Every structure is written in C-alpha cells, then in structure tokens.
UniProtKB/Swiss-Prot annotation:
Biased composition (Polar residues): 317-345
GO biological process: riboflavin biosynthetic process
CDD domains linked: GTP_cyclohydro2
Stretches for region Disordered: 1-27, 312-345
Protein name: GTP cyclohydrolase-2
Enzyme class label: hydrolase
Organism of derivation: Saccharomyces cerevisiae (strain ATCC 204508 / S288c)
Taxonomic path: Eukaryota, Fungi, Dikarya, Ascomycota, Saccharomycotina
Reaction(s) the record says it catalyses: GTP + 4 H2O = 2,5-diamino-6-hydroxy-4-(5-phosphoribosylamino)-pyrimidine + formate + 2 phosphate + 3 H(+)
Amino acid sequence: MTIDNYDNSKQDSSKYEVSGTGDGRNGDGGLPLVQCVARARIPTTQGPDIFLHLYSNNRDNKEHLAIVFGEDIRSRSLFRRRQCETQQDRMIRGAYIGKLYPGRTVADEDDRLGLALEFDDSTGELLASKATTWDAHNDTLVRIHSECYTGENAWSARCDCGEQFDRAGRLIACDHEPTSNIKGGNGHGVIVYLRQEGRGIGLGEKLKAYNLQDLGADTVQANLMLKHPVDARDFSLGKAILLDLGIGNVRLLTNNPEKIKQVDHAPYLKCVERVPMVPIHWTNSSEGIDSKEIEGYLRTKIERMGHLLTEPLKLHTNPQPTETSEAQNQNRMNSALSSTSTLAI
C-alpha cells in the first residue's frame, strides 16, 4: 500500500482506548492505565534522534509525553497488534522497527537492518527479544519532568526547570559528563514529560503564586495561601509510562526524594541509582541561572521540601545559618527509601 491509496476508514478506533498490560505492571495497585496513542521520530540538536510518544490515560484528560532516546525502547501498548489493522496503519501510528523511508510497506520488519519483531499470536502482545527490544534489566537513565511553561519557554529565572530539562537530554545522549563525572545514557534513556504545570496547580494559579512571591511569600507559602497543596503532582502517571516502555531499572535524575519513593513498583520497576541534578551555576559561576528568585526557590526546596542538595550558600536571599550538609542529605535519602530497600545510591 502506498501513501496515495491509504484508506483511513480502516483505522481501528480502539487505538484511543486506554488499556493496561494485564500482568500487574499497569493499572493495578492504584496505578493509572496508560495507552501510547502515537510515536514519531524527532531529529534533535542533542545529537541522536528521539522518539516522541504521546499518551492518553484514565486519570486525567491530559496528553502526557515520553521523550525516548533509543529506537529499541518500545511501548507495549503502542506495539500491541490490533484487529483489522494493516502494516500501513502500524507505521502511521509509529509501531514500527528501525526507520521509515519512502516505499517501505512493512512495519514489523526492517529489511535494511535484517530485524523483525515477534508477537504472541493469541494476544498480539510484543515479545521482547534482546535483538530488537531494550532489556528491562538494563540500567536506564530517566528524568520524570513536569511541564513548566515559564522555565522552558519564557526564559524564567525563577526556577531551573528548563535547565534541568536540557541537561537531562544532554546526559542521556552522552556516554559521560566530564564536569560532573556522571555516567551518561549513551543514547538510551527516557524523559517522561508530565503535563502538571505549577506542581499540579496550573499556569494561571502559578502566575498568581509568582505575584505572592514578589510580595514576600516563598513557593510553599504561596501555594498554601492560594488554597493549594504544596505539591499537587501525581507521579504515578510517570511510573505507569515507564512500565509501558518496558523499563525495569531506573537511574533517576532528581533531587526530589518523593520521586525516588514513587518510582518503585516491585517487582517490575525500581530505582537503582539517584543521579543528582546540581544547578549549573553552583559548579560554574559563569554559566547557568543566577538570580535572587532562583536562589530563594532552591533554598525553599532544600529547607522546606527536603530536596537532596547542599547549598553553596552565597545567596542574595539574606541566608541564615544552616545545618544543611551531606550527612543531612543522606538522612533524607534514607527516609525516602525506608520502604524501598532495593535502591543503590
């Protein structure tokens, strides 16, 4: 079949329905059900191509995303075979192996690579072969990132969200970051992009919180003054997406102990390492974000939300004496992992 005679009436409407894996990985134990609706290759400025996955779910009406580095990291819900679909249908929604090229007619085989996907004949489920699919036991660099319009699109110096997003991409793409001595993902990893603006309160309420901050409140106080939780995000969506992608061992890019706790879903998913996200300006004063607003933001994260950072404390925010130390960070980490004995730091 060619693009010219493709008949979109043959598309199976069930592709928009949300479904789980049926084996306890997704949709059980309080996890939301997620369904990858579409996947497409995106050439990037980071070096390797990424595959952008769009997800629906039964928890909210938002379209969450997974930015996947590595063609062989495959969504189980996307690649599952569906009744009455054609190979062209599968290619158009992104359920193909290798790369698309003009004239290609088969999604499940790539003649140029000499590889073919395998499926369970009775269920249509993708069978994970090491020759074609990323092994769940591989340690995979992961960032669970929440949407931040101001930090990612409006050059905001109130937060480091945009900086963390960009750095996560660079770390996943590289094999090693010399300045931090962090082992990169070598082209394999995932940024789960959750549409949870303003720690879950939405952009409008976040802008109101900014005004309260200019009036003297910190980020925690501002949320509470607006009758919102300190953090209203739901990281279980990220967990469900990672399970759908067949990820088992996570090297988590975070300073947030709550994310470390929430990523665990025994026996299928565990955090094997926390990779710290130290603000760039703290290690190189000529780079990164330098403002009194971001210093107050980071101080509140550390002192009021328990984030795993040690301040350099040459801040504009009239710092008071602090006992924050590596020992305190270790205590916070131990607390975060009290219910997760499998984590290796």
